[in-house]
């Protein structure tokens, strides 16, 4: 499990150019050959590139320093030094790059395979062969390589969750997302604990799933009551909906009906999304009987049962997430 990062700072540097070479041709029968010092290689660039299978910025640490390679120095016999290797920083789609010092946005990478050169490497210095003239037949100097550049950047990722947890207030969404991810969604026993989406990431075999703990829905949400419009705006972007229903309450079917009705009224297309019905709080009295009744009533739905405190059904639920989401 990894903490989801939607913003972090990186200090990136392009490579220095290699120094030009001071060299003179020395061959048999040519004791005083002319200058033959080659040019230095260019320094590596800093390139940001979108990678299709990335969903988070978790490849990097906040404040991490990353550098492209320096160019190699020139050599005799007019041989140029090798160019420094570019630094390629892979990011998910919808990543914005800011100058952290000025807070100005520099670039926006939205689509797969988008790429941008953020910093050019330093130019290689000229070798002394370039400075030979009718008045300077044996130049004993060459150019140093140009220094690379450094930027303090802030990356910001626009979050789009694969899975949206929906339910009435206190259905257990925040506790569930805290259980299966590194998120620490604020948990308390009163309605509207979640007022904005909280995001967590589940990682299995280097595949990431982004899960959003969305604000609790109430009856009338489709009319803007409570946090309705905000809730429904966020939910429309997710691939899969997870209806979390508290089966320790005898009103479990009413909770299901409210969720279905509010989605239908706001946008009937939301009901076409893939969904799982998850019965929560199986550890409480009467919950198992209600869970069995829920499965019987919703026989055509995929219904799973969990208990966060007894760890019942958690692994099965995570496996179900990965089987449904297109990684």
Curated annotation (Swiss-Prot):
It is an enzyme of class 3 (hydrolase). This is GTPase Obg. Residues 2-160 form the Obg domain. It comes from the Bacteria. It comes from Borrelia duttonii (strain Ly). One of its GO terms (cellular component) is cytoplasm. GTP binds at residues 167-174, 192-196, 213-216, 280-283, 307-309. Mg(2+) binds at residues 174, 194.
């Amino acid at each position: 499990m990894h903490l989801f990062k939607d913003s972090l700072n990186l200090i990136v540097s392009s490579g220095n150019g290699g120094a030009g070479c001071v060299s003179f041709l020395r061959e048999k029968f040519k004791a005083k050959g002319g200058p033959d010092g080659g040019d230095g290689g260019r320094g590596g660039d800093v390139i940001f590139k979108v990678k299709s299978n990335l969903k988070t910025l978790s490849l990097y640490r906040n404040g991490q320093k990353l550098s492209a390679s320096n160019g190699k120095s020139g050599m005799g016999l007019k041989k140029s030094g090798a160019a420094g290797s570019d630094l390629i920083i892979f990011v998910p789609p919808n990543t914005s790059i800011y100058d952290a010092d000025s807070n100005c946005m520099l670039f926006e990478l939205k689509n797969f395979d988008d790429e941008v050169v953020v910093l050019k490497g330093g130019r290689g210095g000229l070798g002394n062969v370039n400075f030979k003239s009718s008045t300077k037949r044996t130049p004993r100097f060459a150019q140093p390589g140009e220094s690379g550049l450094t930027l303090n950047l802030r990356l910001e990722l626009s979050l789009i969750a694969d899975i949206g947890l929906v339910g009435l207030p206190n259905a257990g969404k925040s506790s569930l997302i805290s259980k299966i991810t590194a998120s620490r969604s604020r948990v308390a026993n009163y309605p509207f604990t979640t007022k904005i989406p909280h995001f967590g990431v589940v990682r299995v075999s280097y595949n990431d799933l982004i899960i959003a703990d969305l604000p609790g829905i109430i009856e009338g949400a489709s009319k803007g009551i409570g946090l309705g419009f905000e809730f429904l705006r966020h939910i429309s972007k997710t691939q899969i909906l997870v209806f979390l229903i508290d089966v320790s309450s005898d009103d479990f079917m009413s909770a299901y009906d409210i969720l279905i009705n509010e989605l239908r009224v706001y946008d009937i297309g939301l009901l076409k999304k893939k969904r799982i019905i998850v019965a929560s709080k199986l550890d409480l009295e009467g919950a198992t009987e209600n869970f069995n009744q829920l499965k019987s009533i919703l026989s055509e739905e995929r219904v799973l049962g969990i208990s966060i405190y007894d760890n019942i059904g958690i692994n099965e639920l995570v496996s179900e997430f990965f089987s449904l989401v297109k990684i």
